[in-house]
């Protein structure tokens, strides 16, 4: 069996510029990738940006610019972070790139063809700040009958 290792940072949201948490995660991931390479393991280290979602739409509206313009501006800052930190990533991927879109479509179609994706009904509450669906039992009911997540979203 080949001695291969794949590691990736989270794909960072571009609703804002990078902060210390992004740097920390990137450095930790880079450390592991470098250690694996020094140990003789064929290692692929990827990072990049997620350029979809309500957070990005809202941030673009708040800055009076188009979402893709915000993505272009902030994704460049994340790419710059990889250079400033001297990260050893093999690639930087944006979810708005054609290669990512084509790959995601290909994977989706394969999952559909295999019957791994199906229509169903789901009930829950969506938290934009957490980008997560919650069951009502997982929420905290407020005095005004609204709900909060444990993170406050």
What kind of region is each of these model predictions?
Residues 1-153:
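N-terminal, positively charged nucleic-acid-binding surface of large information/translation enzymes
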């Amino acid at each position: 069996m080949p001695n291969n290792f794949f590691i990736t940072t989270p794909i960072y949201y571009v609703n804002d510029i990078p902060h210390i948490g992004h740097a920390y995660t990137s450095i930790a991931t880079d450390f592991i990738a470098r250690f694996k390479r020094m140990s003789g393991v064929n290692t692929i280290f990827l990072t990049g940006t997620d350029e979809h979602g309500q957070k990005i739409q809202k941030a673009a509206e708040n800055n009076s610019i188009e979402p893709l313009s915000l993505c272009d501006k902030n994704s460049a800052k994340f790419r710059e972070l990889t250079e400033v930190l001297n990260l050893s990533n093999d690639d930087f991927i944006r979810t708005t790139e054609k290669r990512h879109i084509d790959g995601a479509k290909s994977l989706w179609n394969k999952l559909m063809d295999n019957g791994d994706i199906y229509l169903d009904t789901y009930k829950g509450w969506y938290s934009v700040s957490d980008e997560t669906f919650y069951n009502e039992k997982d929420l905290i009911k407020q005095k005004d009958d609204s709900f909060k997540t444990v993170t406050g979203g």
